[in-house]
Amino acid sequence: MNVWTKFFQPPKHIKEIEDQEVVKKKYKYWRIRIFYSMFIGYIFYYFTRKSFTFAMPTLIADLGFDKAQLGIIGSTLYFSYGISKFVSGVMSDQSNPRYFMAIGLMITGLTNIFFGMSSSIVLFALWWGLNGWFQGWGWPPCARLLTHWYAKSERGTWWSVWSTSHNIGGALIPILTGFIIDYSGWRGAMYVPGILCIGMGLVLINRLRDTPQSLGLPPIEKYKRDPHHAHHEGKSASEGTEEIERELSTREILFTYVLTNQWLWFLAAASFFIYIVRMAVNDWSALFLIETKHYAAVKANFCVSLFEIGGLFGMLVAGWLSDKISKGNRGPMNVLFSLGLLFAILGMWFSRSHNQWWVDGTLLFVIGFFLYGPQMMIGLAAAELSHKKAAGTASGFTGWFAYFGATFAGYPLGKVTDVWGWKGFFIALLACASIALLLFLPTWNATEKNTRSKA
């Protein structure tokens, strides 16, 4: 723990720069630099997370595994990733995101390379489970950076734009693996992303930094004169800034701002079911199109890319609407988008007798649009309904539930599909989307103010 503390501990705050013109110039520079660095870095996390998914059809043909066996491999990643998101969230709230995010990315690159060197289910599960653990090092440091460098009054926009990194990464990896598989098989589709991510990890060490105060800049609330954190407790802006900049103990983070927060439990439970749908569509839709409509792998993977692109637009629209229409309250958009998701899944099932790829691509685009809105908003709402210094833990807590749910998109859903066919697959998705909608309803008016009043 001593070695961990020395290596990963956040840098100390330095004397605040007094020249306001210098402060303004430096804030502008570092906000842009940190944003594009963590944005691109998270795209690369997706390269090592989803490489196996799109190599799966070729791996089946090469090694003869069935869907349930491959589902086990997928479930090991989601299970270890889910636990890691919570544990890593606690660690990241007390760590330097510069090294935390970068080292995690490099280790995921190594696990992809070792996966490509293996041929047995046991080794596949081992490397993919280890990959899942270090995938959990990607998101919590981003939550920490987003809450320290961007004020609440603007955070919905910045958060939604950053969240499109999920979709860009998810859209690029099937195209990348599709071309690599054509030239060097599924093993090459594991090696190349792994090598790229090791290199990107070194770039992150160079580009990222921790809090504004570690660079001599004032806290973002002071710089932006953001009243949100102070006014809901009846404090002055300066008192509110001092309170939210106070470092919290692990006990305070867990038992004051996370585990006793009723809204986080609703969000976490909804996230469980949203992620079953998300990972099911992402992991199995290409195989669905190949088996039922006999599409070539490249065409099926392209349709899945449209799912990610739809999600990109969905997150941007959801973030903008929650800022402008519901005034920073994320609950209404979660409910409305979940309702749209239900109808989009129904449309995909009823189109199963049509073999036009553009119809399937459009429907996957619409599913992505309505699914990624609440998927993004859950993490944002969790961070805002807890505490600035507990943002990584709060988002990690909901992420823990999310990826525990995602494990059900692996072996359990693979078994459902083996036994009841694709009809059973779609019934499961509809059930999950319906439950998520019901869980979002109580959070319609959830805000920081009524979170504190119930504490």
Swiss-Prot record:
Annotated signal peptide: none
One term of GO molecular function: glucose 6-phosphate:phosphate antiporter activity
Main location: membrane
One of the record's GO cellular component terms: plasma membrane
Membrane-topology annotation of the record: Multi-pass membrane protein
Pfam families assigned: MFS_1
Transmembrane segments: 34-54, 70-90, 113-133, 161-181, 185-205, 257-277, 302-322, 331-351, 363-383, 394-414, 424-444
Disordered: annotated segments: 219-242
Compartment(s) of residence: Cell membrane
Top-rank taxon: Bacteria
A biological process term (GO) from this entry: phosphate ion transmembrane transport
PROSITE patterns linked to this entry: GLPT, MFS
SUPFAM superfamilies for this protein: MFS general substrate transporter
Keywords: Cell membrane, Membrane, Sugar transport, Transmembrane, Transmembrane helix, Transport
Family: Belongs to the major facilitator superfamily. Organophosphate:Pi antiporter (OPA) (TC 2.A.1.4) family.
UniProt xrefs under NCBIfam families: 2A0104
Annotated function: Transport protein for sugar phosphate uptake.
Entry protein name: Probable hexose phosphate transport protein
